[in-house]
Amino acid sequence: MGIYQWRDKKKPSGGKRRYYYKVKRKYAAGRPPTYTTLSAAEEEERKPVRARGGSYKIKAKKVAFAVVSNPKTGEARKARILRIVETPAHREYARRGIIVKGAVIDTTLGRAVVTSRPGQEGVVNAVLLEEQGQKQ
């Protein structure tokens, strides 16, 4: 079991934390993060992963396009992602080109904020920022 999601140490009611000896369970196992990056070419790479309960998550490894919606008109269009401007989650992600929820991206339609979780949903959905939406 590589990544483990449970607490390894348990705090008893009136004392310090000590190791909690319990059998590891399969449902407590985790996976390394996906780190969805911007694809240099127009080809995209996705990987299905079995989730708990037999369902599947689609993990996007490399993406080139985003579904960008305009809040003023309510229409959504497919746009090419040009670059990642900033990522509030972690400064290093923008430098490495990793797309996460909340990241600000430059698209062919303008600057937008990512609203989906590409590492778990397999698609990049974004909403145009207000200053860009007024110019169009």
Swiss-Prot record:
GO terms for biological process: translation. One of its GO terms (molecular function) is structural constituent of ribosome. InterPro entries: Ribosomal_eS8 (IPR001047), Ribosomal_eS8_CS (IPR018283), Ribosomal_protein_eS8_arc (IPR020919), Ribosomal_Se8/biogenesis_NSA2 (IPR022309). GO terms for cellular component: ribonucleoprotein complex; ribosome. Keywords: Ribonucleoprotein, Ribosomal protein. CDD domains: Ribosomal_S8e. It holds the Pfam family Ribosomal_S8e. It comes from the Archaea. Part of the 30S ribosomal subunit. Belongs to the eukaryotic ribosomal protein eS8 family. PANTHER family: 40S RIBOSOMAL PROTEIN S8 (PTHR10394). This is Small ribosomal subunit protein eS8. It comes from Aeropyrum pernix (strain ATCC 700893 / DSM 11879 / JCM 9820 / NBRC 100138 / K1).
